[in-house]
Amino acid sequence: MAHAEGFLNLVKDAKKRIKELSVQDVKKRIDAGDKIILVDTREDVEWARGHAAGAIHLGKGVIERDIENVIPDKEATVVLYCGGGFRSALAADNVQRMGYHNVISMDGGWKGWTEAGLPTIKD
């Protein structure tokens, strides 16, 4: 299904304020030993079908409510991903507004991660 114009405009606006990295750049940082908290912002059903190895789950619907309890360190490097990079961009914008300083949205999201053959797990 094609994304609605209003949604795409919200994402475009959010992307002006956030940092994005490609799937490959995120993997390079992980391989280099950078301390990264990888957060899957997809819906529960999407998470259950499989997710990036090492990721934690804070769905887009609850991330703003729960992130401070799950990741209290607002200086932590937090990489958010969703299906393709749109919802995670919106979430990254909100999380930054909450005072987190090192928030990154992974461009390409789950689709890019799996297409690159990177490690996944299924709960």
Q: What is each of the regions a protein language model found here?
A:
Residues 1-36, 41-77, 83-123:
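Rhodanese-like catalytic fold shared by cysteine-dependent sulfurtransferases
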